[in-house]
Amino acid sequence: MMAAPSSPAGSAVHTVESLQAAAPARIVVVIAAHNEAALLPFTLPPVLAQLQPGDELWVIDDGSADGTARVARAAGAQVARRARPAGSKGQALRWWAAGAGAHVDGTWGVLVLDADSRPGADCVAQLRAALQAGIVAGQALVQPVDYAGGVLRELGACSELMEQLLDDTRRAARGWPVRLRGTGMLLRGDVFAAAVRRLCTRIEDVELTLFVAAAGHGIAALHAAQVLDPKPASSRDAARQRARWLRGQVRVLRMHWRVVLAVAARGPGGLSLLGSVLAKPRSVLVACKLLAALLLAGLAAHAHALPIVVPAVLLFMWILPDAIYLARGLRLPQTRGLALRLVFAPLYALWWLPIAVLAARREGRWRSPRRAAPDTTTAPLRW
């Protein structure tokens, strides 16, 4: 499915725009890497196999000490090596765009992948077709893999799939933009260059989403193209990753509040997009609503007070869409078999408490721990 319908008349956000050139779209795949020599042999060959003559594959070696640049060159990628680490994926992308990637213009499409992500069958071809159809920015379907065997990992993967297959599909059907997700992000070259120079936090996917939407461009859900994305190998690694997200959300609100207001001013589509990137974590928000409703219901039953019954009923009605959403999500082919895991949902919500503590601590080097290979071996990314 390529969910990229035209926007309705009068919509503030347009899904499809004209490509600058009539020539076939060229693709440049960009992978920012810090000490990823163990991962790149699994990532680069599937990418190279899908490229056409004229396309490019770049690995940004951000001050690695493990031979990342050597491994990337041996695999056939072009390498831009930064001797002093930029410290984050967003900063590495900005550095590349200002130097080795300065030739990328509106006739190119920029596909950003993580060092451990693997494109699905015909992924690049589907994204190229989207560019030629006039798509300015889009997000491939991020398909979680290597998450079986851990309750928290399985619940996280289920949540990620439901958000894409339900929420993003609904937004696309209404001509609204969807969020970018860090890997599988496709942007036309000129749009990428304009947005990437403003990156300054460690959640570059949220920043790029806001910058592109605030500029009036649509972000299409390109679910015909899939990117396989391994999940963190342990709950501890996943907690560190999510702590970085929470910390980044605070920085985004503090540093880009004008951009947030500009996106909100674009109407329902903009507000929906803001909810997608900033109203997180959803599990905690739903849990808070449920606890508040149960508390009010208990008070009403104890005091027999009608003024308390009314808000309790309203809160339960507010939770009803979440229950319907969950029921629909568990009927998806990709999430079948996970219904029994819902007994651990309260644990998943409570898991965010130590994450909030981690987020409040001093920020260290950016980390995105993942499985190292498509087998049972695990190793964290050390960025």
Question: Where are the regions that the model predicts?
Answer:
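Cell-envelope/extracellular polymer assembly enzymes that use nucleotide-activated donors
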Residues: 26-28, 56, 207
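Acidic helix N-cap motif at the loop->helix transition within catalytic regions
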Residues: 41-42, 66-73, 122
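Short, acidic, metal-binding catalytic loop of nucleotide-sugar glycosyltransferases
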Residues: 45-54
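A conserved acidic beta->alpha catalytic loop
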Residues: 46, 61-69, 84-86, 117-118
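Conserved donor nucleotide-binding strand/loop of the catalytic core
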Residues: 58, 69-99, 141
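Acidic donor-binding/catalytic loop of UDP-sugar-dependent glycosyltransferases
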Residues: 67, 114-129
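Long helical/loop segments within the catalytic core of UDP-sugar-dependent glycosyltransferases
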Residues: 88-92, 96, 100, 126-200, ...
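Membrane-embedded multi-pass helical conduit in multi-pass membrane proteins
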Residues: 279-363
